[in-house]
Each structure stands twice: as structure tokens, then as C-alpha cells.
């Protein structure tokens, strides 16, 4: 069975490695294949399951009335496990999901939402920072909006699980 058959696909979003369901599915498929090739291997997903369960629990504890926006759709697969509401302006989101540049109107809508206190949390990807994303981050800083940085890959020297734990810990401090 293909991963996409059991994992929710968010249209146009390639950041599936942040989806706990995808992590479970990949680990299960790898363990199954190892055990098929070598019946003495006894490959298990126990460690992955433990990490994933902890991540899901932390995400479920985020405030229910949280409104968030993203400078790039890096956290869709993380935030789908929360009851928070994505308030990223639609035009801005469409531009970034297709790897395009948002219009001046999209930027204005985003900064207005921040200034009007409609955004509790800004999710910012420092690894894909553009001038537009930097301006949005500055507007969020000026408005005292919480900012959580989530990169596409862990910083140098940091392994995935440690980084993912740090990301969910940062979200949990809101």
C-alpha cells in the first residue's frame, strides 16, 4: 500500500515528513520490508511509535483558540493535529504553496491581519526567507505576535527527532 493511501495529502505541500501519520507509515513499511528480507531481524517501530505518540500528545495540548499564519506552508502537517485555525491570507498562501511570490495586496492583507491582532502565532521558515517573509516577521515582532521558527530540515548537527521535539516544545509554550 502506498503512503498516500493512508496519509492525508495537503494539496501542493511537500513537507510530509512533519506528519506523524507519515512517519508511522514509513517506519512500518521499512520494518515490514526488513522482516520480509530477514526473518531473524525482528525490526520494530517501537522507538518511532514512542516519538510519534509524544509529538501527537504535545500538539493536542496547544490552545484551542489559537489563530496562526505561516510565511511558507511548512507546518501544515504539524498543525493539522491541533485545533488552531490557519488565518494565513488566501492569496498569500496560494502564492507560496506554488512557490511563487505573493503580490503587494497579499502582503498588505497579511500585515493588516497581524496589526489587527488576528494572528496569535506566526510560523516562520528561516531557511526560505524572502524579503516579503522578512517584512511579515518584522510586522509580527512589532505587534508582539509569538513567532516560532520551523525549518525544512534540522539545523546542522541536529538530528530529526531532537529538532521535531524542539519545534513542538516551542509551539507548546504558547
What is each of the regions a protein language model found here?
Residues 3-174:
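Extracytoplasmic metal-acquisition and chelation regions
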